[in-house]
Amino acid sequence: MMLKFIKSIFKTPSDRIIANLKSKIQQVHSAESSLAKLSNIELRNKTSEFKARLANNEPIDNIQYEAFAVVREAAKRTIGIQHYDEQLIGGILLHQGKVIEMSTGEGKTLVATLPSYLNALMGKGVHVVTVNDYLAQRDSDWMGTIHRFLDITVGCITSNTNEHARKIAYNSDITYITNNELGFDFLRDNMQFTNQSKVQRGCNYAIIDEIDSILIDEARTPLIISGPVSDNTSLYPIINKLITKLNKDDYEMDEKLRNVTLTDLGINKLETMLAEINILAPNSNSLYDFENMHLIHYINQSLKAHTLFRRNVDYLVKNGKVIIIDEFTGRTMDSRRYSEGLHQALEAKEKVEIQNENQTLASITFQNYFRMYTKLSGMTGTAMTEATELKEIYDLDVVTVPTHNPVQRIDYDDEIYSTKKDKYSAIIQLIQECYSKGQPVLVGTVSIEKSEELSKLLHSKKIPHNVLNAKHHDKEASIIAQAGRIKAITIATNMAGRGTDIMLGGNAEMLVDQSNLTEEEYQEKLKITKMQIEQEKEQVINAGGLFVIGTERHESRRIDNQLRGRCGRQGDPGQTKFFLSLEDDLMRIFASDRVTNILRTIGLKDGEAIHHPLINRSLATAQQKIEAQNYEIRKNLLKYDNVMNDQRKVIYEQRNEAISSDNVNEILHNLTEELIVETVHKFIPPKSYKEDWNIHGLVKEYHHIFNVKLQLDSIEATDSSLKVIEYLTKTAFDIYKQQEQDYSAKSANEAIKHIFIKTLDQTWKEHLYTLDHLKQGISLRAYGQKDPLNEYKREAFDLFKQMLLHLKYLFIQRVARLHIDLASSPKSTSSLLETSDNNLKSKIITENSMAHKYFGKISRNQLCPCNSGKKFKHCHGALK
């Protein structure tokens, strides 16, 4: 009571912002009064009028309220829905680049039509981002009706959209798309060889639905495009078999940090088993001998697969493949694989086909991707718990928008039991009570395993129900849409159909099958169904509305709030209650020993529940600790990714410059001049005496780079390094001029551009591989009293400089050996690029033989003499 009294006196920042905006809403109503008289064509023509005003440099905010009024009127005429005042407030806040928190059922999808229309008038594109293909398609079809009526083009991109259709969709005024498709299209675009092959047109304005899920839950996992490497996978099943023979004394597991390590007993046992099957190196009996170090990687990953990763919790097996389950949404992530051999270890554990390990070709986090947008905003039902992170990472303010009708949902206190068995018995009893009076129930679980366990108990009681988890995700929308019908019992994992409202009495549109009906028959049947649903809705309301049951607390308070928010939409009644046990993961791993000891001391009897403020406070504290821990992980990931992001910007900028350039001679000449200066200074140090010059070394090096034998006399006749540089530069440029004469300037330019882009991609890919390895072991620097992040920054920068040097060296070396056989192939760009590729492949052999000829006998672990900074075996010695 005291808290409510204080809140009534001291308004929150959100309250003050909303109060200021309420006066602005009147401007929308004023503008709308004249619009109602317009014909459809006249209303549509307002779009071209707005565009003309913006083209004359009128500020977009000047037309905001009139544009909102146009959208409101168009929505009324097309889909029969009019924006509430609260939705207009939400639209204003989204246009301002804020995150709005709106309760379930308050019409966030409709709100997005306001700022998306307004900003689409600028002609730079608006992306409305959703969490899955179904919602992207649904919103595009439904809300797109409003936009198309107003002569605004609308596109939709899902995982099944082809390249041509993607380009058309991105060029639309408004594009509905998932976050994954956006990120992967960005990475793919930066692997294309021409601007025409790219599909995106830049990052202007994005409205992110379920923004907390995308920018927070998924921020820990970077988007990666990878390619297979020819690593040996034969060891995974062998090591897997040995790991199954270990027991709990052979390893120590920390569930809180999700880490597992072998004990001395486990190491000894493994060494014995490895020796018996002749896996250890000859004359070696220790796993940690240098010759056996590679085995540790396989052992660690297999141990993790068996102890930390559970089937139907962290992953599922479908059609002979291990598929990751998103821990936050409960959905499958079909296109993703665990890195560093973990996925292969899981495949060995589940005895399915083991695929090769992958190497990163391109990578970006959602954090860095969405920060590229000129303007960003978002919507969700639960954002206030993450307001600090959204502000610190993305500079986004969160504002809570009031509900249109007062919330009538009742949230009961948690019930805590000593065992899972007692907890499930209480849940089943409550479900039976609700079922007997016709009250619909939604049961939220944290994993597939738990949802199927509960389903078996309901089957044993002969209670009909639906199960919604990653195994049945294809029926997600239809199951959730009907979860508000009389006697409907629905068990769902975290996914819980976010984005699909649970309507009391059911959803008429989804109940009527239109496939075999004429439009007239469909409308008639829909009318009858809606009347039946209205009657059913009254019965459900009288029974108490939808009852949401939580079977355990999640690690994040936000996900608990999302589950509660499934009921009580638009002022409907609803009830929620969480059932917990001391055996739940959250209680077992994170709750304090003090709480557990108190409960053990109390000595709960079988089937007896406890309600205690200390328990609720302890749970809230445990959740806050986990949220803080996950926030630190995300912040840390961003700090490391920022290092790569700066480098990524340089590479992508250089790549795009080359692709867009009609003439790459400037790039070629600049890099040639830089390389020649560096090479000359290596053999003729600045301000050195002539007798200290290493002319023989310089001649060999120049021949290795440009495939040209210099006359010693020409260099010996000069008296300064500057003149040597001029002579060598002229010689190199003469090579390029000769190529233009031999093949034509256009053909040579196309081939050189192709060589530059391919060489850039190759060196960048190798650099990412090196950074991956650097990142894996960098945390160990802390033991040497060094900051791992600073060490990573320093070494990553050094590696980047070495990569740029290697790029320069390899590119010029390849151009100098360019040969296009015009006699045997037509003079077209496509065939020219193909010929250029073939020449590059054949040239590699030449490079390698030259490397051994001029470098002599070199250890494979020595640094390559070409100054790339790489080991010889990874550079010129890699092609042996």
Curated annotation (Swiss-Prot):
Compartments it resides in: Cell inner membrane; Cytoplasm
Protein name: Protein translocase subunit SecA
Catalytic activity: ATP + H2O + cellular proteinSide 1 = ADP + phosphate + cellular proteinSide 2
NCBIfam families referenced in this protein's UniProt entry, alphabetically: PRK12904.1 (NF009538), secA (TIGR00963)
Pfam families tied to this protein: P-loop_SecA, SEC-C, SecA_DEAD, SecA_PP_bind, SecA_SW
HAMAP family per the UniProt record, alphabetical: SecA
Species whose genome carries this gene: Orientia tsutsugamushi (strain Boryong) (Rickettsia tsutsugamushi)
Any one Gene Ontology BP term: protein transport by the Sec complex
Gene name linked to the record: secA
